Amino acid sequence: MRAYVLIESAVGQANAVGNGVGKLTSPNARVISVNAVTGPFDIIALLESNDLDKLGQAITDGIQQVEGVQRTTTCLVVKLG
């Protein structure tokens, strides 16, 4: 399963947050991509895991612990049709 994690960073911290998220290693999930974006979020990361609980753990124990992360919103990828 995959999820997009929309990340809001502290002012002036988007670059550091993006770099920090990109360097995360977790036995629970793999970071596939990290991109800076415009709009209400600063960074969007794509994660992949074989288990929903492990994915959640990677977000709470990994991404949310990166210095400068203020808030995350997780969007699970679903198949249409």
Annotated model-derived regions:
Residues 1-81:
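A compositional/biophysical signature of low hydrophobicity enriched in polar/charged and small residues
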